[in-house]
């Protein structure tokens, strides 16, 4: 799950939360913050803590992300300002480390999370978000467009890697990045190209406001659960 840095609020006040949509698209790109699907048709403003639980959160920049209809529907209204800390969030935590995508299938990265946090708290928070969004395609009982699109992205990324192995030119690199940006599913592409640091670095640059503090110089997730400045805070 791509970690993002939205930056400070670009507006002082807005009357309706829908007015935050263009600001969010500019800040983090038109991708679902959770499943990473490209939001071509109907991007929706997502309230991390449900807007029905606290009117003060309805237009608050810190409570807003972008999401697809599938993730918003599955997430529901469970999260509040009180229990928000029971979950990891892509605009606050190292979700690049928290989840892995073997063969393009998302799962909680338990081994890495427990290495960073031996108490198991971070792993539980990641699992809570994973379960809340119903990201595991192996237990879904209903047709899930997120799964279909992710599988398509994995296939395209795999074919792109094969092309890269044959032709490692700057032109090919640029084409791969353009294809990834157009398709979405950042983490799937990062997984497929995990042994190609030149591609990983460019991928991080190409997807808007990806949180670079959570990646090393070769484009791989670092063993941190918070950004360095936050981790240093008592």
Predicted regions: what they are:
Residues 1-31, 53-62, 157-158, 177:
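Short, charged surface segments at domain edges that flank catalytic/cofactor-binding sites
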Residues 71:
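DNA major-groove recognition helix of helix-turn-helix/homeodomain DNA-binding modules
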Residues 7-10, 20-23, 39, 43-46, ...:
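Amphipathic, alpha-helical segments enriched in basic
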Residues 76-166:
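Domain-level detector of nuclease and nuclease-like folds
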Residues 25-33, 116-121:
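Phosphate-binding glycine-rich loops and adjacent basic patches that engage nucleotide phosphates
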Residues 124-234:
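C-terminal, charged low-complexity interaction regions
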Residues 34-66, 75-91, 95:
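Histidine-centered nuclease catalytic patch
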